[in-house]
Amino acid sequence: MQVEQVDFISIPTRDVSRAVAFYRDVLGLPESDSRPAEVETPNVTLSFWNSEADGEEFVPSIGGFAVRVADVAAAVEEVRAAGAEVVGIDDTGVCHMGFVKDLDGNTLILHRRYAPRG
């Protein structure tokens, strides 16, 4: 097998409409044309799933995923103002990262690499 690309990331939520609104209005990601429970990034779809509606326990994703932003500090303040929890900010010597939790407690990493890989 050869994986061609990542098509979507499934994100648990207790309220699909609220999750879509947060990622659309705060992160500026457009809603999907094909499914009301999704938003689009330039290279992967974020798909929201209400596990409790399917009779499953809700458990937020703690591993997270990273989205590239122009200014990590400014992005962190934007999500904080929208009600998200800021967990921490880190500078690794290669990139800046802001670790936040969305309105459902899912980890989201606001990221900007400033040094080349290597």
PLM features: what roles do these ranges have?
Residues 22, 73-78:
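Short amphipathic alpha-helices within nucleic acid-binding modules
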Residues 15-30:
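Amphipathic alpha-helical segments
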Residues 38, 66, 97-99:
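Short hydrophobic/aromatic beta-strand element in the GNAT-like acyltransferase core
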Residues 1-17, 45, 62-65, 114-118:
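N-terminal beta-strand motif that seeds the catalytic metal site of vicinal oxygen chelate
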Residues 28-62, 107-113:
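Conserved short beta-strand elements that form part of the metal-binding/catalytic scaffold
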Residues 15-16, 70-73:
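Helix N-cap motif at beta-to-alpha junctions
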Residues 7, 34-35, 63, 85, ...:
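Residue-level marker for the onset of beta-strands and adjacent loop->beta junctions
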Residues 1-2, 11, 76, 80-118:
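Vicinal oxygen chelate
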